[in-house]
Amino acid sequence: MDRKEMISMILAGGQGSRLGILTKKLAKPAVPFGGKYRIIDFVLSNCSNSGIYTVGVLTQYKPLELNSHIGIGTPWDLDRRDGGVYVLPPYQEESGGNWYKGTADAIYQNISFVDNYNPEYVIILSGDHIYKMNYANMLKFHKEKKADVTIAVIEVPIEETYRFGIVNTKSDMEIYEFQEKPMKAKSTKASMGVYIFKWTLLKRFLKADQSDKNSSNDFGKNIIPNMLNSGIKMYAYPFRGYWKDVGTIQSLWEANMDLLKEDNELNLGDLNWRIYSVNHVEPAQYIGPKANIKSSIAVNGCEIYGEVKNSIISSGSIIGKNSKIIDSVIMPYSKIGDNVIINKALVGSNVVVRKNSIIGDGREITVIGSNKDIKAESLLVSS
């Protein structure tokens, strides 16, 4: 097997508990996004567009739909004989198997997979972030700095630093301190969960971490601090572009709404950096004679007979006559009946909302889980 300069390992096993009923039956990276995508499509597309064609996807929680979506990687040009995409569930030993105990443990359990390719570098990625990034540029930075580890960082508002791992750097971006979700941060450089490591170095620290019974087996809590304490040369790679951790209902709704802005940074129409997904064969969208659509995305296969404003109507969904969809996301194959008002909501896949119902009041985000059947004349408002 030819040696790879760099392979990627995507952490995609998260339960996504903060997304509530949207992840009751599927992993967070498999949640629909933007009308025709799933969240994991972004990191897979980034790998392909960056020339990384050997990809391990580490799954765990409710993996069936995610595994089916990824398949052999054809939509992302990852169905290759020399490389490809591999779904890696928790390792099963003769004595039984355990779930991944943490992000570092997930990589540790797959050391043999990485060793098969004998890469010089490994890039560790999260499968639940929305962004477009050229990892080849980050690797170039890593080499120029002669770094052992490089962490991609993005500037965040000071009031949000408590949600992230925060890096403190010298003027040349060398990292001298890492604060995991600090109450009082010293900088606003937040880790994006994108790491490049020299593989031999990372493997050594993973094995040492595994032998520490008090470790959480986590990159942010254990591996990165341990490396810094050992004097490992670590740099921060500044990323300037759109990036969103869609781990909450609020952030998922915001990321979808961001797509509807005229000057949206993500720009899914950019032909130079396409976001690929599984393309189901759908008929063209149908817009009824009395439909009214404004500042919205309506994907192939949907039918719209009512009013849609600042919303996303996903593939295969139907909006009934005299219905109003405002500031909302209707996920794939949902059926909205006649005379329904949906205002500031996330409606899951395969949902039926029957006639004369009201969903949401435009203040808090109302969420309806997948496969729900909302009876006629219902009133559902987030409390």
UniProtKB/Swiss-Prot annotation:
Keywords: ATP-binding, Carbohydrate metabolism, Glycogen biosynthesis, Glycogen metabolism, Nucleotide-binding, Nucleotidyltransferase, Transferase. The keyword Transferase applies. It catalyses: alpha-D-glucose 1-phosphate + ATP + H(+) = ADP-alpha-D-glucose + diphosphate. Gene3D superfamilies: Hexapeptide repeat proteins, Spore Coat Polysaccharide Biosynthesis Protein SpsA, Chain A. Alpha-D-glucose 1-phosphate binds at Y100, G165, E180, K181, S191. It holds the Pfam family NTP_transferase. Its EC number is 2.7.7.27. GO terms for biological process: glycogen biosynthetic process. It comes from the Bacteria. Pathway: Glycan biosynthesis; glycogen biosynthesis. It is an enzyme of class 2 (transferase). InterPro entries: ADP-Glc_PPase (IPR011831), ADP_Glu_pyroP_CS (IPR005836), GlgC_bac (IPR023049), GlmU/GlgC-like_hexapep (IPR056818), NTP_transferase_dom (IPR005835), Nucleotide-diphossugar_trans (IPR029044), Trimer_LpxA-like_sf (IPR011004). One of its GO terms (molecular function) is glucose-1-phosphate adenylyltransferase activity. Homotetramer. PANTHER family: GLUCOSE-1-PHOSPHATE ADENYLYLTRANSFERASE, GLUCOSE-1-PHOSPHATE ADENYLYLTRANSFERASE-RELATED. Belongs to the bacterial/plant glucose-1-phosphate adenylyltransferase family. HAMAP family: GlgC. Involved in the biosynthesis of ADP-glucose, a building block required for the elongation reactions to produce glycogen. Catalyzes the reaction between ATP and alpha-D-glucose 1-phosphate (G1P) to produce pyrophosphate and ADP-Glc. This is Glucose-1-phosphate adenylyltransferase.
